[in-house]
Structures are given as C-alpha cells and as structure tokens.
C-alpha cells in the first residue's frame, strides 16, 4: 500500500 500500515506495506 502507499500508506504506512503495520501490514508490511510500501512505506
């Protein structure tokens, strides 16, 4: 994802 999430997305 483009958003900083706790799922290991694209930060």
Swiss-Prot record:
Q: Which domain of life is it from?
A: Bacteria
For the protein in the UniProt heading, the enzyme class is lyase
List, in alphabetical order, the Gene Ontology terms for molecular function in this entry. heparin binding; lyase activity
The answer on whether this UniProt entry bears the keyword Lyase reads yes
pH dependence of function: Optimum pH is 7.2.
Keywords, in A-Z order: Heparin-binding, Lyase
Regulation of this protein's activity per its record: Inhibited by Cu(2+) ion, nitrogen and lead. Activated by reducing agents, such as DL-dithiothreitol and 2-mercaptoethanol.
Temperature-related activity data read: Optimum temperature 45 degrees Celsius.
Kindly indicate whether the keyword Cytoplasm belongs to this entry: no
EC number of the protein: 4.2.2.-
Q: What's noted about post-translational modification?
A: The N-terminus is blocked.
Question: How does the record describe its quaternary structure?
Answer: Monomer.
What does this chain do? Degrades acharan sulfate and, to a lesser extent, heparin and heparan sulfate.
Could you identify this protein by its name? Acharan sulfate lyase 2
Q: Which organism is it from?
A: Bacteroides stercoris
């Amino acid at each position: 994802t483009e958003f900083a999430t706790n799922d290991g997305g694209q930060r």
